[in-house]
């Protein structure tokens, strides 16, 4: 945990008495000699890292195995989705999980949505355990984390959390700061050789679907009678919260079906 008065978008994850200490195993407070310089407190906890390059194809395969029909289309209005059912009949219920697209999608146009720009550096160097910090000296939009992916997926060095920034190209100055923060915190990642010892695979930028007020999971009825179940605005925790949010969506859909006799 960084010094007080320096706020980060990730602050809800960091507390001297974190809510998840009794949910995840292996929790312990770090000793003073284990802390990163400039930090007042820290802890260790069992966690996991998802290699998305492996996980997403597997998840798609599970959907296909379950009989899900995949279609690609460009929609200007959410109501257009009701005509895309593989049955050839209009759907009575549409689940909207369009992420950042919900900002401009007709029929939704949620102005509380904004991009939260994230820039990372993917390297071949290995570094365990994972590390995450509540803030840095480089401004409120810049954070520090190190995540080694399983299955030879490289190690992700981060990063940024810049709300309202649409820039999709990596910034070389930010990339240098990311790498410097990482080697300062974990010099062992390069065997003490500094930034020059990092074997960079690529630089990347993603736009997280940030929503002021948090994720939106609720039902809404359009003027034409179509029911929409919204599930968007997960910001940077879409993978972590996906199963819980999906269960909430299923509950809403089933409740609507019982109440209205609708078909999804």
Question: Where are these predicted regions, by residue range?
Answer:
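Active-site lid/adjacent beta-loop-alpha segment flanking the redox-cofactor pocket in flavoenzymes
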Residues: 129-212, 221
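Amphipathic alpha-helical segments that form well-ordered structural scaffolds
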Residues: 54-62, 177, 181-185, 248, ...
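Short, solvent-exposed loop/turn segments at secondary-structure junctions
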Residues: 6, 100-102, 162-163, 235
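Flavin (FAD/FMN) cofactor-binding and adjacent substrate-gating region
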Residues: 1-67
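Central helical "cap/lid" subdomain
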Residues: 77, 81-136, 168-176, 185-196
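C-terminal catalytic lobe of FAD-dependent flavoproteins
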Residues: 33, 192-264
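Helical element adjacent to the flavin cofactor pocket in flavoenzyme catalytic cores
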Residues: 39-93, 97, 102
């Amino acid at each position: 945990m960084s010094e007080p008065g320096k706020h980060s978008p990730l602050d809800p994850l960091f507390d001297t008495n974190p809510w998840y200490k009794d949910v995840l195993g292996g929790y312990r407070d770090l000793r003073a000699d284990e802390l990163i310089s400039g930090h007042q407190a820290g802890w260790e906890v069992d966690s996991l890292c998802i290699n998305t390059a492996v996980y997403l194809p597997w998840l798609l395969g599970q959907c296909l195995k379950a009989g899900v029909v995949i279609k690609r289309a460009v929609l200007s209005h959410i109501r257009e989705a009701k005509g895309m059912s593989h049955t050839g009949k209009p759907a009575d219920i549409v689940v909207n999980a369009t992420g950042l697209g919900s900002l401009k999608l007709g029929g939704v146009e949620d102005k509380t949505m904004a991009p939260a720009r994230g820039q990372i550096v993917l390297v071949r160097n290995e570094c365990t355990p994972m590390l995450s910090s509540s803030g840095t000296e480089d401004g409120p939009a810049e954070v520090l984390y190190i995540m080694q992916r399983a299955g030879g997926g490289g190690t992700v060095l981060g990063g940024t959390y810049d709300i309202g920034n649409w820039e999709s190209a990596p910034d070389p100055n930010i990339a240098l700061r990311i790498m410097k923060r990482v080697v300062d915190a974990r010099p062992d990642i390069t065997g003490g050789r500094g930034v020059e010892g990092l074997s960079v695979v690529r630089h990347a930028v993603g736009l997280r679907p940030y929503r002021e007020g948090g994720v939106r999971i609720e039902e809404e009825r359009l003027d034409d009678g179509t029911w929409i179940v919204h599930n968007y605005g997960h910001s940077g925790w879409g993978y972590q919260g996906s199963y819980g949010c999906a269960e909430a969506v299923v509950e809403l859909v089933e409740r609507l079906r019982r109440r209205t006799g609708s078909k999804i």
